[in-house]
Each structure stands twice: as structure tokens, then as C-alpha cells.
Amino acid sequence: MTQQSPYSAAVAEQRHQEWLRFVALLQQAYAEDLHLPLLQLMLTPDEREALGTRVRIIEELLRGEMSQRELKNELGAGIATITRGSNSLKSAPVELRQWLEQTLLASDK
């Protein structure tokens, strides 16, 4: 196992700060009802479609009615994308998972 160089750590920190800056910008855009135009500016149509697909993946994984292979066929997503979603969901904080269940599966009740 190799250690990251200080440069790599610095780059990682810079990227993290850029991500936090984007999140803050998005929060402000929501507060000012500019979130849709901001997201359309920042994301390509393909990226917006990919985010929609990821929401569906999480929703279906939470629902638990389809296998990952069935999800792949249903959504046209790669099995690696579905597996990453599954692994991320498993490591998500309990509060987030509960919120996602309440929010995404509300129509099931």
C-alpha cells in the first residue's frame, strides 16, 4: 500500500472544498427558487438523466422487490452502477436511509 503524496492530499482537499462550495450554492439557489435553472446550467442533459436513474436505483433497492439484474434490465443501467448504489445505501447513515424510505416510498403506502 502506498501513501498519498502531500500534493494528492492537497488536491483531494481542494476538490472537497469545491464540492462544499457547490452544495452551498445549491442551498442558496433553493432558498431563492433558482435551483432548476442552476442545475440546468451546471449539469448536461446526460448528467441530469443519470441522476434521475440513480434516484430510481435507490428507490427500487429500498423497495426490495427486484434483483440487481432485474434493475439493470428495467433501468438500462450498468450492473456496476447498481452495485455502487447498493453499497452506498448499505453504508448510508440510518437517518438518511429512513428519510429516503419515507420520501421515495411514500406513494407505496
Curated annotation (Swiss-Prot):
<dbReference type="InterPro" id="IPR038116">
    <property type="entry name" value="TrpR-like_sf"/>
</dbReference>
<feature type="DNA-binding region">
    <location>
        <begin position="68"/>
        <end position="91"/>
    </location>
</feature>
<comment type="function">
    <text>This protein is an aporepressor. When complexed with L-tryptophan it binds the operator region of the trp operon (5'-ACTAGT-'3') and prevents the initiation of transcription. The complex also regulates trp repressor biosynthesis by binding to its regulatory region.</text>
</comment>
<keyword id="KW-0804">Transcription</keyword>
<keyword id="KW-0805">Transcription regulation</keyword>
<dbReference type="GO" id="GO:0005737">
    <property type="term" value="C:cytoplasm"/>
</dbReference>
<dbReference type="GO" id="GO:0045892">
    <property type="term" value="P:negative regulation of DNA-templated transcription"/>
</dbReference>
<keyword id="KW-0678">Repressor</keyword>
<keyword id="KW-0963">Cytoplasm</keyword>
<dbReference type="InterPro" id="IPR013335">
    <property type="entry name" value="Trp_repress_bac"/>
</dbReference>
<dbReference type="InterPro" id="IPR010921">
    <property type="entry name" value="Trp_repressor/repl_initiator"/>
</dbReference>
<dbReference type="GO" id="GO:0043565">
    <property type="term" value="F:sequence-specific DNA binding"/>
</dbReference>
<dbReference type="Pfam" id="PF01371">
    <property type="entry name" value="Trp_repressor"/>
</dbReference>
<comment type="subunit">
    <text>Homodimer.</text>
</comment>
<keyword id="KW-0238">DNA-binding</keyword>
<comment type="similarity">
    <text>Belongs to the TrpR family.</text>
</comment>
<protein>
    <recommendedName>
        <fullName>Trp operon repressor</fullName>
    </recommendedName>
</protein>
<dbReference type="InterPro" id="IPR000831">
    <property type="entry name" value="Trp_repress"/>
</dbReference>
<dbReference type="GO" id="GO:0003700">
    <property type="term" value="F:DNA-binding transcription factor activity"/>
</dbReference>
